[in-house]
UniProtKB/Swiss-Prot annotation:
Ribonucleoprotein keyword on record: no
GO molecular function, one term: phytanoyl-CoA dioxygenase activity
One biological process term in Gene Ontology: fatty acid metabolic process
Lineage per the UniProt record: Eukaryota, Viridiplantae, Streptophyta, Embryophyta, Tracheophyta
InterPro entries in the cross-refs: Phytyl_CoA_dOase-like
Positions contributing to 2-oxoglutarate binding: 98, 137, 152-154, 169, 239, 248
Protein family membership: Belongs to the PhyH family.
Annotated source species: Oryza sativa subsp. japonica (Rice)
Catalytic activity entry: phytanoyl-CoA + 2-oxoglutarate + O2 = 2-hydroxyphytanoyl-CoA + succinate + CO2
Pathway(s) annotated for this protein in UniProt: Lipid metabolism; fatty acid metabolism
Keyword NADP attributed: no
Cofactor: Fe cation; L-ascorbate
Name of the protein: Phytanoyl-CoA dioxygenase 2
Length: 281
């Protein structure tokens, strides 16, 4: 019997062919509740000093608040959270876009999941030698104002040489076409990385324009709470605005191999301390 989280040959074949894989009931209802309850506590203690996050406008990636979030638990507001008067239009807990990017290191509840046997076994199946979580995000996709995430590849932002980023997207609520589930182009990871975000002394830029994608090629990845979506670093994926009346909470981890793969000094995310590996061969 395979260890918990391990992938079968059939699952590995599907992932290799399509660039994504949905694992049903990866986390228990108790694990999901623990993470959601913990985030509610973190938000309750949040003093409101954050920044706005948008994938359409990357100006926020140029500021110090964003850069420092690499090793902090930082709060980012939705673009549409504020009125013309500069005040929140809804309660604080309904105004946050995401919390990142070091929950997996600094919070015991999220660290327990991130360093758990299921996650480690999954990356052992993918033949990672020394995997490490490089960033973590709790994403809210708030009702009515949950922002669009434009088509992208994770390796654009989290590049190693050779490329090694794999994303884990854990649904903490049911994700449907109505409330902003993930969409992906099956097999698009085979076309290679199209562009990179480059960080210099105090700025960021893309080395190539954003490609144009045919929306008809995307398929919805509707999942239940507790399901996990595994995402190849070159897979083209996106999510639309959440215009519904229900949120779509999710936890996102991005994992790289730290053995035989060099973290780019041009990535926006630069750490003072190397990330702790999930395991070492």
């Amino acid at each position: 019997m395979l260890p918990a989280g391990s992938l079968t040959d059939k699952q590995l074949h599907f992932f290799d062919a399509n660039g994504y894989l949905v694992l049903g009931s990866f986390s228990s209802a108790e694990e999901v509740k623990a993470m959601r309850d913990r985030m509610a506590v973190l938000i309750d203690g949040f003093d409101g000093a954050g920044d706005v996050f948008s994938t359409k406008d990357h100006r926020q990636v140029k500021n110090d608040f964003f850069f420092k979030s690499a090793e902090n638990i930082s709060f980012f507001f939705e673009e549409k959270a504020f009125g013309d008067d500069g005040c929140l239009k809804q309660a604080k807990e309904l105004s946050i876009n995401k919390v990142g990017h070091a929950l997996h290191e600094l919070d015991p509840v999220f660290k327990k999941f991130s360093f758990g046997e299921n996650v480690s076994s999954l990356f052992s199946s993918l033949r990672y030698k020394r995997p490490a979580v490089i960033q973590s995000m709790y994403i809210f996709k708030q009702p009515g104002i949950g922002g669009e995430v434009v088509p992208h590849q994770d390796n654009t932002f989290l590049y190693t040489n050779p490329p090694s980023c794999t994303g884990l997207w854990l649904a903490l609520e049911d994700a449907t076409k109505t409330n902003g589930c993930l969409w992906a182009i099956p097999g698009s990871h085979k076309n290679g990385l199209k562009r990179r975000m480059i960080r210099d002394e105090n700025d960021t830029h893309f080395d190539h324009p954003s490609p144009t994608y045919d929306l008809k090629e995307f398929v919805p990845l509707e999942v239940k709470s507790g399901d996990l979506v595994v995402i190849h670093g070159d897979l083209v994926h996106q999510s639309f605005e959440n215009l519904s009346l229900v949120s779509r909470h999710a936890l996102s981890l991005h994992v790289i191999d730290t053995e035989g793969c060099e973290w780019s000094k041009q990535n926006w995310l630069q750490r003072k301390i190397p990330p702790q590996p999930l395991y070492e061969n």
